[in-house]
Amino acid sequence: MIERGKFRSLTLINWNGFFARTFDLDELVTTLSGGNGAGKSTTMAAFITALIPDLTLLHFRNTTEAGATSGSRDKGLHGKLRPGVCYAALDVVNSLHQRVIVGVRLQQIAGRDRKVDIKPFSIHGLPTAINPTEILTESVSARHARVLPLSELKEKFEAMESVQFKQYNSITDYHSVMFDLGIVARRLRTAADRSKYYRLIEASLYGGISSAITRSLRDYLLPENGGVRKAFQDMEAALRENRMTLEAIRVTQSDRDLFKHLISEATNYVSADYMRHANERRIHLDAALLLRNELFTSRKQRASEQYRHIEMARELAEHNAAESDLETDYQGASDHLNLVQTALRQQEKIDRYDADLEELTFRLEEQNEVVAEAREVQEDNEARSEAAELEVDELKSQLADYQQALDVQQTRAIQYQQALQALQRAQDICQLRDLSVDNAEEWQETFQAKELEATDKLLMLEQKMSVAQAAHSQFEQAYELVTRIAGPVSRSDAWQVGRDVLRDAGNQRYHAEQLEPLRSRVSELGQRLREQQDAERLLSDFCKRYGQQVDAADLENLQAELEAQIELLNESVADAGERRMTLRQELEQLRERIARLTKQAPQWLAAQEILSQLGEQTGQALENSQQVTEFMQQLLERERETTVERDDIAARKREIERQIERLSQPGGSEDARLNHLAERFGGVLLSEIYDDVTIDDAPYFSALYGPARHAIVVPDLSLIREQLDGLDDCPEDLYLIEGDPQSFDDSVFNVEELAKAVVVKAGDRQWRYSRFPKVPLFGRAARENQLEVLRAERETLAERFATLSFDVQKIQRLHQSFSRFIGSHIGVAFEPDPEAALRQLNGRRNEVERELNNHESENQQQRQQYEQAKEGVSQLNRLLPRVSLLLDDTLQDRHEEIQERLAEAQEATRFVQQHGAQLARLEPILAVLQSDPEQHEQLTLDYQQAQQQQRDARQQAFALTEVVQRRAHFGYIDSAGMLNGTSDLNEKLRQRLEQAEAERARAREQLRQHQSQLTQYSQVLASLKSSFDAKRDMLKELQQEMQDIGVHADASAEQRARLRRDELYGALSNNRARRNQLEKQLTFCEAEMDALQKKLRRLERDYQQGREQVVSAKAGWVTVLRMVKDNGVERRLHRRELAYLGGDELRSMSDKALGALRLAVADNEHLRDVLRLSEDPKRPERKIQFYIAVYQHLRERIRQDIIRTDDPVEAIEQMEIELNRLTEELTAREQTLAISSRSVSNIIRKTIQREQNRIRQLNQGLQAVSFGQVKSVRLNVNVREAHSTLLDVLSEQHEQHQDLFKSNRLTFSEALAKLYQRLNPQIDMGQRTPQTIGEELLDYRNYLEMEVEVSRGSDGWLRAESGALSTGEAIGTGMSILVMVVQSWEEESRRLRGKDISPCRLLFLDEAARLDAKSIATLFELCDRLEMQLIIAAPENISPEKGTTYKLVRKVFNNTEHVHVVGLRGFSAEPGAATGSADVGAH
């Protein structure tokens, strides 16, 4: 036998008065004994909180604020806790000996609302030796411990492998685990279930008869028959759906023609517009592409013209630049010619003035010589005149001095003084400080010798002077010629320079002789150089036109290539005409074939559309007409086979429906007559008695009773004996068994059980061997199981039957479609695809057109290449004669070399022309330059110096002589000798004075005469000099002008300049002609470009408009396509045959359909509005929206469960197949699903009987319960009178109320409610609807009235009410009822929980002092018999003899309040050891 789970202990952590306390719970009764405030209610509150941690339910009244009902107020739990983390944990061992600790963590929340936070948890697999207190606290010291928070507790168990810790976020999950482990008796899924459980605990806790429970005993004791109720609801829903479907089918049948017309016209309306927009979009797209191609072609042409314009503009710019350069060169050449002519005239002037200057130079030189000679004579005369004057002056002076000294009366002192003066003067003149009278003679001799020497030197110099006077004029003339030729030179270097000049003059004359040959050579090379530059320019132009760099050596090869290219281009141009003609003929043929196939395509497309539909319907590829005819024969054969199979399925389905109907009989009777017989005999069907047998036991009992399994159990067979006479409406074999239906068992048989069989010994000579049936039908569970199998098979057969029926109809319609196809389209359907041929032909046409365009462009390119080649050959013809010039790389160097030599020759010629005469005059007198022209002057200076030296020497000698002569004066004065000497000297002086004066007069006269002659000579020289200077200045000006002109004029210069000017004029004329031609071509090109630009603007504008139209249309078209594809209507709208109709035809087709649609949707406001919006031609998507709206409207009007498709068009096609079949099938189904009122009555009655039997069994467990004067307690279950009348009418008089149950407007529930109102008009139904009332009437619990009765004293059975019972009697009665509820819950939940688990049973009782000792003993006995645990709270004076008693005393120690607990095992036993010592102090 399975052991019942037990609560082992209750642990309180950090509660008010309990810091860490574990109460071991007794297997029966645990008593909490103590005075007021000892903690009994706190302990029970902790237990209840751990069981039901729902703050919306917890309400501990004895400690709660009076009248408090708000959820935000304290419910009595906040005050029982201490600050910090608190725990309430239950240690449980279930039937499987699994230890589980379930509990809650509680914590006060600060605030005025005094709320509490609760977190449920559970611990699994904890070893038995570990106390719950040890795991929820942590020891800090010997007397202190710390409460672990939930997070640390979780971490602590995560470290233990065998222990599992779970934390729950919802109370439902927490109770689900408790139910699965057998801790609570009922699965508490909802808040209502928790409320019932809490009300049960609350009623137990506070004792007495709870009016909250007794008023709703049906909810606590009677299980909800959800299966029956759901079956009724499903049947009603199926009937309702069936009726709605039938109504929808009828409406659909009436609207089918409207639907077909609507979808047909909507398809024509939208598809015509859809295809028109598609065609227009394609046309616009093709036009845009054509415009784009034309635009690109024009752009290419414009680019080509621009390139040509740029090239011509570049060439024109080059010609303009060249023209400017040529004009400049021409003007320069003209100016150069003018300069040459001017230079020639200047050169003539220069030559003329040069000749004049040469003549003047010769005359000037002669006159200079004359003037020089006259000036020399003049100087000599002046010198003689000065000498004469000096001599006269000196003689006069001497004579005067001597006159003064002639005084003979002078004393010797004066003479002596004169001698001394003479000596002093001699010392000064001779610069002899040591001169004396004694050595005066010696010094006189010395100075006289010097005087002689000076006189000799003077004579020698005079000789040289005479020689130099003769060569002086020739030296000056030669020196002047050297300086004029070589420039300024020193007189000392004149001879060397003159010799070098004469030596270089020969080279200059040789170079001058080479001038004319060099000039002709330079002219020739210049001409060739210009021709080379022209050839290079032509080659450069040719390379630019040719597009690549070409060497001069390759020009001949290039000419051959161009000539060959010209020949090829001539041939290709000749072939181009034939090719163009061929392409145009082919293009015309293609256009004709395209037109023919375009007419044929719509018929072929219509045939292909039907053929594709037939292919989709058949799933086969129909490739030829023979396959079509063969498939028609196959369709006929398949129709015959499918019809036979459908009839077989229909027969099997009817058989299964008969079996289901037989098994669905109330009470399990397979024959409806047995129910009537059972009611007639007052018995019960055996199948009803065993209706609750499990499916596992069903084979055994089915074999046990054998044929008697459909027997009727009656109380007394003798009472029905007479009724058997004349009984004819019954089965062939009717079995009757005597027995009490309330306590019937199988003891009437002697049975021996075998393997999968039984042997029933009916007598000594009669045995029956029955095997267990493979499909047992005994018992409701077995029948329901078989019914499920049969219903599933019936559904399968129904689906198969529907499928086959649909297939038959489908095959028939498919055969008709094939017949129509053969009659209309068989002739064109299997011909080649004209659209494929059109695509190929269009592709070929495009290729031909492209090839023709390419041919035209290639022909044009060839013409351009031909023109370029001809022009290239023309340029090469001009270049080839000049190839040698292009290849002559030394021409420039040779020209420069000859130009340098020509410059040297010109310079030599200019030198010879300028200095030829001077060189001729210099050559014979060059030798005079050997003497330095400055030596004559030096000689003159030396002569004068020698003359001065001779004069000084003479004076010195004279002074010494005077000293020597005055030597006597140093003695005594010889007056006589002095006077005689003075007279002689005076006479001599006078004679000399006369001579000197005469010489002076002659010199003066000669000087005067020569002065006048010199003046004449000077005037002639001045005249010659002024004339020479004027002509020389004019010559310098002419030479400067010649230098400024910068032209060397020669005999051929003018001819060369004129030839150069004429060449440049010819080049300028050619350049101007080419420039004018380019300007004309450029003007023509600009005109073409302007025309192209206008064309491009027009094309761009047209293309932009077309592109904007295409883009805008594309945006709308993309929206249309997306809508079409998303809604799956593309196949309906994209009708390819309409693509070949014109826009006017499609518009006419759409307008006709629009008129028909306006009439068709006139009564539908939504479709009418959508149709009106769709008429906007600028919004094509609105037509699609209208089509979708039509589709949606059809989808809503056509049942998708009837028509197995999402396409309304296909649905309309299938509708004709399905409607008749579904109508018949649904009508039959409604008859099958129709609920019989008699069946409903029987089901409700049987359910009531079953629950009454279960309540009787529960009452048997309460018969021995007694409290005080109460001897027994029982539950009384009665059927309400109004509901009993309803059942009787449903069973017996249902024919009178068929107007309700046969109405298609009322469901069975509504019909049942209407019948109930009809039978009980006095009852007020309030605001409830008939459907709600009918659903309540289908619940059997609403038919029953339950009340608790007690047998008390002499009063007998009385209704249990608190006012009629004492407190103890009320507590005992209430406890008995609660035990009954718990037991009922366990039986109800046994099928939800494992069979090997027996749940815990525990109730509470507070304030047990209200019971006497006998009542408590009875309560203990009840707990023992029902294996129930009980926790009671009693005052200190009550100590039960059995169970475990805890003495609770609240104490205060060191300002800490705690509850001292002592545990006792029975009253008479010694006080046992407490489960734990006093609470340790809080940490």
Swiss-Prot record:
Residue ranges that the Swiss-Prot or TrEMBL entry lists as coiled coil: 311-426, 547-607, 835-1115, 1206-1266
Region (Flexible hinge) location: 666-783
Gene Ontology biological process terms in this record? cell division; chromosome condensation; chromosome segregation; DNA replication
The compartments listed are: Cytoplasm, Nucleoid
Question: GO CC terms on record?
Answer: cytoplasm; nucleoid
Task: List, alphabetically, the InterPro entries matched.
Answer: MukB (IPR012090), MukB/SMC (IPR050308), MukB_hinge (IPR032520), MukB_hinge_sf (IPR042501), MukB_N_dom (IPR007406), P-loop_NTPase (IPR027417)
| UniProt-annotated binding residues for ATP | G34, G35, N36, G37, A38, G39, K40, S41
Q: Where is this region: Disordered?
A: 850-870
**One Pfam family matching this protein:** MukB_hinge
Keywords noted in UniProt:
ATP-binding, Cell cycle, Cell division, Chromosome partition, Coiled coil, Cytoplasm, DNA condensation, DNA-binding, Nucleotide-binding
* Major location category of this protein: cytoplasm
Tell me a Gene Ontology molecular-function term this record carries. ATP binding
* Entry remark concerning the domains of this protein: The hinge domain, which separates the large intramolecular coiled coil regions, allows the homodimerization, forming a V-shaped homodimer.
Quaternary arrangement and interactors, per the entry? Homodimerization via its hinge domain. Binds to DNA via its C-terminal region. Interacts, and probably forms a ternary complex, with MukE and MukF via its C-terminal region. The complex formation is stimulated by calcium or magnesium. Interacts with tubulin-related protein FtsZ.
What is the protein's known function?
A: Plays a central role in chromosome condensation, segregation and cell cycle progression. Functions as a homodimer, which is essential for chromosome partition. Involved in negative DNA supercoiling in vivo, and by this means organize and compact chromosomes. May achieve or facilitate chromosome segregation by condensation DNA from both sides of a centrally located replisome during cell division.
So what family is this one in?
Belongs to the SMC family. MukB subfamily.
What PANTHER family does UniProt report for this protein, alphabetically? CHROMOSOME PARTITION PROTEIN MUKB, DUF4476 DOMAIN-CONTAINING PROTEIN
Record protein name field: Chromosome partition protein MukB
Which organism encodes this protein?
Erwinia tasmaniensis (strain DSM 17950 / CFBP 7177 / CIP 109463 / NCPPB 4357 / Et1/99)
